């Protein structure tokens, strides 16, 4: 589980529901199922013999559906997904128990109420499977790809990676020039592969020369040295990863690379939170692992 998801808009907007086919379909079916169960329960109670337990199920599921609707419209699903799964799991017990109390009755209103509770149970199972899975899960990635507010660079605020990842040692102080980072500097969360365009070795090694680009300079116009080209060519990329979100590189960090959602990248090492990757056009650099999924 990620510890932080970055800042996201907390405003309530029905457009997030309308723009998300999965949320729109499941919430609509859930509301319809609740109405069927509610109306049928009233008619069943008039006939007599309706189990009182089923009324509590209706009240509980009303707040569950309302809670899911509010979290989706507020773009707070990843913040409250654990609570959502917990309440829905309890609701599933209530709805299935109500079905068991009603489905065997020959009275038509009882059967209609049972049908409503069955629909509520089915929607609850779907929600538990969706919200109980990580955002990187294949089925969630597929479902979220159709949501308008979760697509493209504009949805950066809804991605499951904390903005704190960019606060690595090399970017905390703008006066420090870019360099090849050692495992001690990175505390073990970077890959040990050398970054493209930078000579290897610890900070201050003799292999470093003035051809390395500097912040704010015109380093992009300089030609890499022969040693750097050999070093870059020696890196192997045995893994392939697919981008599940678009990522815009930090302009203050020349090591990072930008990529678009669904891009296929070659990866040299998958042991840290930042992976050494190569784009199809040959550009190399580091990419956040939470934006990628191995193929």
Curated annotation (Swiss-Prot):
Annotated GO CC locations: plasma membrane
Disulfide bond annotation, renumbered to this chain: none
Cell compartment(s), UniProt: Cell membrane
Compositional bias segments (type: Polar residues): 155-176
Pfam name, any one: SH3_1
Coiled-coil residues: none
Region described as Disordered: spans on this chain: 150-176, 191-233
Subunit: Forms homooligomers.
Similarity remark: Belongs to the SHO1 family.
Name this protein carries in UniProt: High osmolarity signaling protein sho1
């Amino acid at each position: 589980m990620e510890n932080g998801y970055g800042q996201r808009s907390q405003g309530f907007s029905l457009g997030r529901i309308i723009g998300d086919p999965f949320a729109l379909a499941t919430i609509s079916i859930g509301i319809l199922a609740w109405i069927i169960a509610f109306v049928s329960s009233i008619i069943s109670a008039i006939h007599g013999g309706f189990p009182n337990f089923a009324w509590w199920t209706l009240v509980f599921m009303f707040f569950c559906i309302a809670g899911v609707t509010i979290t989706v419209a507020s773009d707070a699903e990843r913040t409250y997904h654990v609570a959502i799964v917990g309440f829905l799991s309890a609701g599933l017990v209530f709805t299935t128990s109500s079905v068991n109390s009603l489905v065997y009755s020959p009275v038509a209103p009882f059967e209609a109420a049972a049908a409503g509770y069955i629909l509520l149970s089915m929607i609850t199972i779907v929600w538990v499977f969706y919200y109980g899975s990580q955002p990187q899960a294949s089925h969630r990635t597929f479902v979220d790809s159709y949501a308008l507010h979760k697509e493209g660079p504009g949805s950066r605020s809804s991605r499951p990676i904390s903005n704190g990842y960019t606060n690595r040692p090399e970017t905390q102080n703008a006066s420090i020039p870019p360099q090849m980072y050692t495992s001690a500097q990175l505390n073990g969360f970077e890959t040990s592969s050398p970054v493209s365009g930078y000579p290897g070795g610890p900070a201050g090694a003799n292999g470093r020369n003035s051809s390395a680009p500097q912040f704010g300079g015109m380093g992009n116009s300089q030609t890499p040295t022969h040693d750097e080209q050999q070093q870059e060519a020696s890196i192997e990329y045995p893994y392939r990863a697919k981008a599940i979100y678009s990522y815009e590189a930090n302009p203050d960090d020349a090591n990072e690379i930008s990529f678009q959602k669904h891009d296929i990248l070659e990866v040299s090492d998958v042991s840290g939170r930042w992976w050494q990757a190569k784009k199809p056009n040959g550009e190399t650099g580091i990419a956040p692992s939470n934006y990628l999924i191995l193929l």
